């Protein structure tokens, strides 16, 4: 468990600030298995989780859906045979907010 998993997401409005470069450097250290991707100029967090079969991948996807609904923050999810790709970013600000790091940490916690 890290400090992020005990935090709650806050409502993110279009005028909410994106994480600064310094915040990004600090927060990414707390979720070392995640990478930063830039798509269409939008910074996103992404991780691929591996599973033994599709049923386990789907079970993880469903657990993630429940966690996302509970926090009111939703990822991009690609579920395939043996793997799930999860992408977090804040749509309203077209970039990364602290909520994305909180949810990345909570996503990792679902494996426990």
From Swiss-Prot:
DNA-binding as UniProt keyword: no
GO process terms (BP): tetrahydrobiopterin biosynthetic process
Gene Ontology molecular function: 4-alpha-hydroxytetrahydrobiopterin dehydratase activity
EC number: 4.2.1.96
Record key words, sorted: Lyase
Catalysis: reaction(s): (4aS,6R)-4a-hydroxy-L-erythro-5,6,7,8-tetrahydrobiopterin = (6R)-L-erythro-6,7-dihydrobiopterin + H2O
Segments forming a coiled coil: none
InterPro entries: PCD_sf, Pterin-4-alpha-carb_dehyd, Pterin_deHydtase
A Pfam entry, by short name: Pterin_4a
Keyword match Lyase: yes
HAMAP family given in the database record: Pterin_4_alpha
PANTHER family: PTERIN-4-ALPHA-CARBINOLAMINE DEHYDRATASE-RELATED (PTHR42805:SF1)
Sequence similarity: Belongs to the pterin-4-alpha-carbinolamine dehydratase family.
Protein name from the UniProt record: Putative pterin-4-alpha-carbinolamine dehydratase
């Amino acid at each position: 468990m890290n400090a992020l998993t005990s935090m709650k997401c806050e409502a993110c409005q279009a005028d909410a600030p994106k994480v600064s470069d310094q915040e990004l450097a600090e927060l990414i250290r707390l979720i070392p298995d995640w990478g930063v991707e830039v798509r269409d100029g939008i910074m996103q967090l992404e991780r691929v989780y591996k599973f033994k079969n599709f049923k386990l991948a789907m079970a993880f996807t469903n657990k993630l859906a429940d966690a996302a609904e509970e926090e009111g923050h939703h990822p991009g999810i690609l579920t395939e045979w043996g793997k799930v790709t999860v992408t977090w970013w804040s749509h309203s600000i077209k970039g990364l907010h602290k909520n994305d790091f909180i949810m990345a940490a909570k996503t990792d916690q679902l494996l426990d």
